[in-house]
């Protein structure tokens, strides 16, 4: 397949096989989008930068951490990002993709069936506030993330209960302020986590600034978290 429209910053991060899989995924998402609208980010830079690059670069940026052969959780996966992107670039990892909308999880299941992923991939239609209190899911993941735009403290309340001790949470943010940093530190103290590292990047093709906050579970999160549906959003810790 032709690669002239793919930014060089992305090509430099991927193997030939991975590029081909992302191109195949793009085709399948477009086909699916014609039947059921799951995302508007399907063409050009919207796909290659806002979907693909934004999903994979955090796991390339923290070079001192091994992200291979892990149990990975994508919360609020939407049309499958970053979970399916992580699956392509980390074929030895086991992937869980969760979304509360059945329309989205049905679409992801179709994508998983149509593309030859090497991973063991699980797609679950439920809310994280419910799943986090199931013993089969809680404290069960090496890595958890969500690209859903939300308060970092709220996202941390969803992520940390799912992590094994010393597991990593990947928080996606736009611009990062001192006030947000202080609020997150306060939340992490309650949830028994800590900030491990932070990276900032200018996304290719003028797609804006992206900050990634890498958090880590120090001790198992208190059983009462996450709180009931709606509370983490309305009243962040």
From Swiss-Prot:
S-adenosyl-L-methionine binds at residues 76, 81, 128-129, 147. It is an enzyme of class 2 (transferase). Its main location: cytoplasm. GO terms for cellular component: cytosol. Its EC number is 2.1.1.-. One of its GO terms (molecular function) is rRNA (guanine-N7-)-methyltransferase activity. Keywords: Cytoplasm, Methyltransferase, rRNA processing, S-adenosyl-L-methionine, Transferase. Pfam families: GidB. It is found in: Cytoplasm. InterPro entries: rRNA_ssu_MeTfrase_G, SAM-dependent_MTases_sf. Belongs to the methyltransferase superfamily. RNA methyltransferase RsmG family. Specifically methylates the N7 position of a guanine in 16S rRNA. HAMAP family: 16SrRNA_methyltr_G (MF_00074). This is Ribosomal RNA small subunit methyltransferase G. The lineage of its organism: Bacteria, Bacillati, Cyanobacteriota, Cyanophyceae, Synechococcales. The gene is rsmG.
